């Protein structure tokens, strides 16, 4: 029994030494690296608005046209929980969760041959997602730079809202009902457009 405890103590000591070696005095050392500060600066650089797609209207069905959409509110995203630093083959990485509390809105203008025009908008009351970055430290000023690694994975998406402005209350009500009746389709639409817009926002903020 005593030998078993002695072996356990030796194993713990060896493991502690190995961890200390990995996280200090090596390429995987996070000492003095302000990861949370880098994430805060990244969010501050997110664009307020980003127009994506065709600038001119294009036909969708007979008499009905749409054009590219505007993504807004990414600069209001918030970090959710602590950043998780780790290493893969000596490369410093960080995993970060973000939360969107309805501040990100995707808006697409539309118009009809009857003269009606308005916007189609999509938002999620609450969404949480996680992504990963490479971390590189400058040897000159010891500052760090993040590089988007991806992928971005949605974790939680709640209450996706579809609004149709300019077509009257009935059209807006129908859009809301369809969003509730077909939640899987609505979520897929949101995930595709949101994650693509987020990827663009990340690249713009980091470049």
Predicted segments, located by residue:
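Tubular lipid-binding modules of the TULIP superfamily
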Residues: 11-123, 128, 138, 207
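A short glycine/threonine-centered beta-strand motif
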Residues: 131-133
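Extended amphipathic ligand-handling, pore-lining, and cofactor/metal-binding catalytic surfaces
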Residues: 138-203
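Sec-dependent signal peptide recognition
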Residues: 2-9
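A broad, structure-centric signal for solvent-exposed, well-ordered loop/edge residues
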Residues: 8, 73, 78, 162, ...
């Amino acid at each position: 029994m005593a030998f078993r405890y002695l072996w356990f103590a030796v194993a713990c000591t060896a493991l502690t030494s190995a961890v200390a070696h990995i996280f200090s005095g090596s390429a995987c050392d996070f000492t003095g690296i302000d990861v949370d500060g880098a994430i805060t600066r990244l969010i501050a650089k997110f664009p307020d608005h980003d127009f994506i797609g065709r600038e001119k209207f294009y036909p969708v069905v007979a008499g009905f046209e749409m054009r590219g959409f505007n993504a807004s509110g990414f600069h209001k995203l918030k970090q959710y929980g602590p950043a998780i630093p780790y290493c893969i083959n000596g490369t410093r990485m960080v995993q970060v969760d973000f939360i969107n509390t309805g501040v990100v809105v995707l808006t697409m203008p539309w118009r009809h041959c009857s003269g009606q025009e308005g916007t189609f908008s999509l938002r999620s009351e609450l969404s949480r997602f996680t992504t990963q970055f490479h971390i590189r430290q400058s040897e000159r000023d010891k500052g760090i730079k993040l590089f988007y690694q991806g992928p971005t994975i949605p974790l939680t998406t709640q209450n996706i809202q579809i609004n149709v402005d300019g077509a009257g209350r009935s059209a807006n009500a129908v859009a809301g009902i369809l969003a509730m009746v077909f939640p899987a389709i609505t979520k897929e639409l949101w995930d595709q457009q949101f994650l693509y817009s987020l990827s663009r926002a990340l690249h713009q903020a980091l470049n």
